[in-house]
Amino acid sequence: MPREVNIRIAGTGGQGVIKAGLVLAEAFALEGKNVVQTQSYGPEARGGASRADIIVSDDEIDFPGLRRVDYLLVLHDSAYRKYYPQVDGETHVIYDSSLVNARRGLGFPFTETSIREFGTPLFANMIAIGALTAMLGLQPEKVEVVIQKRMRKAEENVKAFRIGFEMGRRVTKPKVVSHVVKPYILS
């Protein structure tokens, strides 16, 4: 059984991909996990490629880069086209069905839900993190603590996170990260 989980969150500048990665990484750290979070983004303030990579482990992390992708969370079609070729048949692919035309994976209407609930797409990242949190088995309270501490509009971001958590909970049995099971194949 693997004791390490590798997560990639990908989208475009302006979607809050980096912030989502930081929130998720800090929440895992609050659970006592070893965590490495790296990020990459284009020079454009909005619209360029953006990604956050998170490695979570019970053991020490000896290399800060992803060796494989266990979970790929994609918020934009261009990011899907860029990062989907790097996954294998065991990678969990979760995507924003509002913006991504995916070949396989589990789609959720993150952006549509954000617009419907808040009148703006700006909370889609926290809705997506909520769904991913449910799938990973991360304690939602830990994520909410980080959101309250680090995010502007904390109340709305917590609400968005909870909406996403319920979306994710409805379709999966949570996995406890300290006892990660072999990922299931989404098709």
Swiss-Prot record:
**What single Pfam family name could you report for this chain, choosing any that match?**
POR
Under Gene3D superfamilies, the record lists: Pyruvate-ferredoxin oxidoreductase, PFOR, domain III (3.40.920.10)
Q: Identify the SUPFAM superfamilies for this entry.
A: Pyruvate-ferredoxin oxidoreductase, PFOR, domain III
Q: Which UniProt keywords apply?
A: Oxidoreductase
Report the coiled-coil segments: none
| InterPro entries named in the record | 2-oxoglutarate_synth_KorC, Pyrv/ketoisovalerate_OxRed_cat, Pyrv_flavodox_OxRed_cen
Catalytic function, reaction form: 2 oxidized [2Fe-2S]-[ferredoxin] + 2-oxoglutarate + CoA = succinyl-CoA + 2 reduced [2Fe-2S]-[ferredoxin] + CO2 + H(+)
* GO MF entries: 2-oxoglutarate synthase activity
The enzyme's first-digit EC class, named in words, is: oxidoreductase
Q: What is its EC number?
A: 1.2.7.3
Q: Which PANTHER family match?
A: 2-OXOGLUTARATE SYNTHASE SUBUNIT KORC
Quaternary structure annotation from Swiss-Prot or TrEMBL: Heterotetramer of the KorA, KorB, KorC and KorD subunits.
Kindly provide the name given to this protein in its UniProt entry.
2-oxoglutarate synthase subunit KorC
This protein's species is Archaeoglobus fulgidus (strain ATCC 49558 / DSM 4304 / JCM 9628 / NBRC 100126 / VC-16)
